Amino acid sequence: MKTFDDLFAELSEKAATRPEGSGTVRELDAGVHSIGKKIVEEAAEVWMAAEHESDEAFAEEASQLIYHLQVMMLAKGLTLADVYRHL
């Protein structure tokens, strides 16, 4: 099972090595505005899943939101420590 830290390490590696065909690289190249729109979309899907779908569907949507938040962190040049300071 992948953890929050594992995911960030994986995404950081993709951002650094830029493998061909990577969705993460494509999203980073699209920029902060595009990533932000995706975060808003995913947040709405999390909410709707919480209200109207199974716990499994909610967990899947939450994982997608976490992914896009971490991509935004990379796009902004932030680390996990930058965010953890505010928890």
From Swiss-Prot:
Keywords: Amino-acid biosynthesis, ATP-binding, Cytoplasm, Histidine biosynthesis, Hydrolase, Nucleotide-binding
Top EC class, one word: hydrolase
Enzyme Commission number(s): 3.6.1.31
Protein name as it appears in the record: Phosphoribosyl-ATP pyrophosphatase
GO CC annotation, single: cytoplasm
SUPFAM superfamilies the record matches: all-alpha NTP pyrophosphatases (SSF101386)
Family the UniProt entry places it in: Belongs to the PRA-PH family.
Catalytic activity: 1-(5-phospho-beta-D-ribosyl)-ATP + H2O = 1-(5-phospho-beta-D-ribosyl)-5'-AMP + diphosphate + H(+)
Keyword Hydrolase in record: yes
Domain of life where this protein originates: Bacteria
GO MF entries: ATP binding; phosphoribosyl-ATP diphosphatase activity
Main localisation: cytoplasm
CDD domains named among the record's database cross-references: NTP-PPase_HisE (cd11547)
Protein location: Cytoplasm
Pathway connected to this protein: Amino-acid biosynthesis; L-histidine biosynthesis; L-histidine from 5-phospho-alpha-D-ribose 1-diphosphate: step 2/9
